[in-house]
Amino acid sequence: MAARIIKFDQEGRNAILKGVNTLADAVKVTLGPKGRNVVIEKAFGSPLITKDGVTVAKEIELEDKFENMGAQLVKEVASKTSDVAGDGTTTATVLAQAIYRQGSKLVAAGHNPMEIKRGIDKAVETIVAELKSISKPIKDHKEIAQVGTISANNDKTIGDIIAQAMEKVGKEGVITVEEAKAMETSLETVEGMQFDRGYLSPYFVTDPERMEASLENAMILIHDKKISNMKDLLPVLEQTAKSGRPLLIIAEDIEGEALATLVVNKLRGVLNICAVKAPGFGDRRKAMLEDIAILTGGQVISEEIGNKLENTTMDMLGRAKRITVDKDNTTIIDGDGKEADIQGRVKQIRAQIEETTSDYDREKLQERLAKLVGGVAVIKVGAATETEMKEKKARVEDALHATRAAVDEGIVPGGGVAYLRALASLDALSLPTEQQFGVNVIKRSLEEPIRQIAQNAGVDGSIVVDKVKNSKDAFGYNAAEDEYVDMLAAGIIDPTKVSRSALQNAASVAGLMLTTEAMIADKPKEEAPMPAMPGGMGGMGGMM
């Protein structure tokens, strides 16, 4: 085992503090409407320009191993806040730095770090409760647009597009962000349920100009196995032909004579039919087929539950007002499923989302939920250059997360004002003297976000803090316009979830760092010098 270096007490805490300061100082320049950009070198391609705190934090790795530990712990604060609330990463970093800096001074002066941590925890609990009590539910399109605008660094276009997307697909809908091929940022919405499987043969197309198969008032056969034998399909095809309605077949695959017969019948005009592969794989495929069946009021024809393809009757088929199939996607609009069944399925998926520990599974479950209840919106981000595109796309994603957080838990006045208003709740706390020092750490640290916003705008932070502290309600400093306004009326708002998560995560990690008494790291290896080049071979003197 390699030799280790150990640092104790104040020496260790000072190393952590140096690392925390290095990372936080790089991140906090991005805070607020007048925050600056950070340019990050990339191994390939052009440098990355960003104003996103977590992106800056993730790029920082320090040479000194002990300082790097401090930096990595604060990086964890930014990442966790980003995961939970999707925004507020810079605020969380600023708070973590302030709490640790204030706390480490007290520990150096001989105070008990464990008691300080207890005081910090109790103060944070009180502040979080106060933030929830001053939080206001988000009501309309305008407020959603304001949250999006603030989080996208005051880009009103992005705020408006996100508000439109939320309005169209609802709270549960899926909103994805993609790079556009044009210069403008635009919004596309998909009604109904869409899945990424297109027609199995171009001969199924009904609109050659758009290369689409369009089925009006259609029946849907949903089967979980391959169909290659035509005789299994014949009974259901005969019944559909008699009804004169179009038919969509969704199966694991359709091949051989079955596919050939369907194409021939389509070309002869006997049947208006289209066949697509089932979406997803494995267990997820079964679940998605069941979703389609519930949405359209049909059944999955599966031998597992005793349904054979040759015994399928018309009442087992799903129904939909309109189905559109192109080479890549199938969209089912206005399915005939019972509302009670759909709501039951939605409840079941929500329960699975609560239980799952995998981010990937959660994302896939949310997609399924959106397809059942709302729909899907795609924001296509346009820009003049690739560098601008990446930066803008990151801002849109941040704004989208912040907007969802605002819909979840409501909004509080922005610009660091909510923290100052919540400070009064700490006066009611009656704690032992040592723990009271921890409360004082939080009192001082909660001034830091507004102080930093003012400093980034080129104004004296202390004057701004004092003026806002001595006023009431939502009165605060609008750094974008350099004026004091009612933050709620001016649309400068933060999602409560973001403010809450930033403080909780910052205090959690700062508390751990304060109670650190020893640090262990690998001893740097001394690189052996390169061996000298060997001499020339004998008899080579005459060579040129």
Swiss-Prot record:
Catalysed reactions, as listed in the record: ATP + H2O + a folded polypeptide = ADP + phosphate + an unfolded polypeptide
Enzyme's top EC category: isomerase
NCBIfam families membership: GroEL (TIGR02348), PRK00013.1 (NF000592), PRK12849.1 (NF009487), PRK12850.1 (NF009488), PRK12851.1 (NF009489)
Function as written in the Swiss-Prot or TrEMBL entry: Together with its co-chaperonin GroES, plays an essential role in assisting protein folding. The GroEL-GroES system forms a nano-cage that allows encapsulation of the non-native substrate proteins and provides a physical environment optimized to promote and accelerate protein folding.
Record keywords: ATP-binding, Chaperone, Cytoplasm, Isomerase, Nucleotide-binding
Taxonomy of the source species: Bacteria, Pseudomonadati, Thermodesulfobacteriota, Desulfuromonadia, Geobacterales
Name this protein carries in UniProt: Chaperonin GroEL
Residues engaged in binding ATP: 30-33, 51, 87-91, 415, 478-480, 494
